[in-house]
Amino acid sequence: YSIGDYRIFSPLLYPNTYAALMIAFFFVTSYLTVTTEHRVYRFFSSFLVIPALLSLILTYSRAGYLIFVILYLLILFVMPFIKQLQYLVMSVLAAVMTLGIYPFISRIGIRQQTDFQFGSYLLGWLILLVASALYMIVSVYLVPRFDKLLEERLTHRSFRSYARYIIPVASILMVILGAIALTNEHLIRLLPDPLENRLGNINLRQHSVLERITFYKDGFRIIEDYPLTGAGGGAWNSLYEEYQSNPYVTKDPHSYYLNHAIETGMVGLILLLAFLAFVYIRFIRNRVSDPGYPYRFVFFVFASSILLHSLVDFNMEFLYVSGFVFLCLGIMSSRTTEAVPEVKHKGKHKPQRSLFKLAYLGSMSILAVIILFFAARSVYANKLFTHTIEELNETIPADEALNTFYRILDMKPNHPHYLLGTISLLQAFYDYSQDETFLDHAQHYIDRLKTVDGHFIGIPEFEINNYIKKADIQGAADVSMYWLQRFPWNLTMYESTITLLHQLGMQQYQMNEDPVRWDQAIELYETMKRQVAKIEALPDEQLPGREFTITDTVAHIIADIYYYRGDYTKTISVLEQHVAPLDMS
């Protein structure tokens, strides 16, 4: 369970992705329950239906619930009428049984987080296993008889041609009525409290919806600057702080397709959509002619569940999820064919196809060895870096650590984190020895890091510190202002930049020069006020993200500037607006 809201998750460590997997798992098992002819397959698949549905409910994923309904309707449309009827009946039965045991399982699970009791733990499993076993018995022994009965009664009915649309259309109407029912406070109060809380506030003003809309708008702004081939792998994580509309923190735009467009541009997105269209069109065309279609339908269900949910989440960012999805797509695009008798070639000469196979196998083997070499080199560099950081100043002397970092950079000269670690250690050496050679070396690696990844968030702090350590306050201020244009929501950088500008302005003031640096400090203060106004203009339901406000440090500096300029009214105004009065009690 996640802390606070008790949303169940898995080693994936994300409830929404777990919900997507449970959606796929439910549809696969429930589909096999009503379609497979093998009793053993039906035995195992039916036993897993209720655990999958219960797990989905316990994720409390609103997007997951919505995708579940959409996929359920789509699956109904592609099934024949008799299977639709069976699927509907067995799904309703699974839903009723799951909702029946849900309150007990939920209460036991929540209580176990604070007061683990082995008896309650066993009771929870017993309830789940009994419900699953009952559902399995119904599926294994009653569904085949129900199937034969329906075949006998409905085979000769005249409405058979259009009957397959009756249940899906009726289900759509039921979904609409259910959605309307969720707007009724009296009806929704009949649900258990956790479900009531999650379903009761489904609307476009809900914070997760508003935040996603903000992510998508900012994502499209990135695409505008990198329209064709995109900004490269990991682009969102590197760029979003430069484009964000408010100081939120997220490593993903919460949409697989948007993230793909950001990284690979419109060319990459079009190729992805074309590939998906090819697979799905080929799969649909094989429906009649492919004898293995019913088995491939399972992979269609799984891939569609994840891909549809990925419209509003980042499930595909997990390597094992995306790998399995593309495996499903590969199976969907294939088809079962009859075995072709092998033609034996006579004579001493090997067929040309065999030579091609050998050449292909050899080239792929060489490529695999090369990739394995570079991968092993990268893994070794990472382990060496991690070990050095952990043992620094404990078992490894600082000078030895620096030499190790140089070795790591020889292996991976353009890795941002390795460069940043080396810069940090060089600056620490300067603090100890006051030898500016270390700062020059640090600046060399800073320049390299800016060339390799100019958007890396760790650069500004170390570059500014390098100038400050050299006592180049003017250079530090100029660099700070440059980076503030790139990262307009970095509160710490605003404070440090305004502090530097105040120092430079004071030097100009004492030398009877025009303190233009104070003007720049006031401009940054006005920029901060505009940023604060943007946050205040956000809907009440939307979370603003990181704290961004006019701090006491900034307020005192700006008030000090106005004081030296003789503008006492603004001095008092700034302090009254942003500095809390002292508690004299």
What spans do the regions from the language model cover?
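Hydrophobic alpha-helical transmembrane segments in integral membrane proteins
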Residues: L177-P194, Q352-I396
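N-terminal intrinsically disordered, acidic low-complexity segments at the extreme N-terminus
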Residues: F314-V343
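Aromatic-rich transmembrane-lumenal/periplasmic boundary elements in polytopic membrane proteins
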Residues: Y1, V175-D225
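Amphipathic alpha-helical repeat elements characteristic of tetratricopeptide repeat
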Residues: A24, F47-L48, D193, I213, ...
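Flexible interhelical linker loops that connect adjacent transmembrane helices
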Residues: Q117, K148-S158, R335-A359
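C-terminal luminal/periplasmic domains and tails of membrane-associated envelope-modifying transferases
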Residues: T386-S585
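Alpha-helical transmembrane segments of multi-pass inner-membrane proteins
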Residues: Y1-Y6, S10-T183, I262-P291, Y295-V298, ...
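TM-adjacent membrane-interface loops and short helices in multi-pass inner/ER membrane proteins
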Residues: Y14, L204-Q206, L210-T250, Y257-H260, ...
